[in-house]
Amino acid sequence: MAQVQYYGTGRRKSSVARVRLVPGEGRIIVNGRDIRDYVPYESLVEVVKQPLVLTETFGSYDVLVNVSGGGFTGQAGAIRHGIARALLQVDPEYRQTLKRAGLLTRDSRVKERKKYGLKGARRAPQFSKR
């Protein structure tokens, strides 16, 4: 018999995470490696676990993730977004909890482009009065 799987896609900055939830014992596998081997900061591991802890499903599902683009923070945010979306397929009742915590909203903040004539996006060259 085929195993039940739930899918969700999460995005943050330039990262895209394709998430699969499979009934299991709570392992989080990112690009074939354990989350603790993949992400160098414990705080980012907590960010990834947030939707599972909020819905009290941590330990009930194995999370299998393919993530690409961006850095560690963007990837952790994308994984969190993907897990939250996949949990909606598990039980639509989770929507209110996840929405209240802001986990279903795509964080649209991205780096602002550098403009010509400036040193950065907004930083102007030093001004000399005389």
Curated annotation (Swiss-Prot):
**Could you tell me which species this protein originates from?**
Anoxybacillus flavithermus (strain DSM 21510 / WK1)
Q: What is the lineage of its organism?
A: Bacteria, Bacillati, Bacillota, Bacilli, Bacillales
Report the GO terms under cellular component.
cytosolic small ribosomal subunit
Q: Which PROSITE patterns match?
A: RIBOSOMAL_S9 (PS00360)
Q: Does this UniProt record's set of keywords contain Transmembrane?
A: no
Of which family is this protein a member? Answer: Belongs to the universal ribosomal protein uS9 family.
This protein's superkingdom? Bacteria
Q: What GO MF terms are annotated?
A: RNA binding; structural constituent of ribosome
Checking HAMAP family in the record gives: Ribosomal_uS9_B
- The name under which this protein is listed is Small ribosomal subunit protein uS9
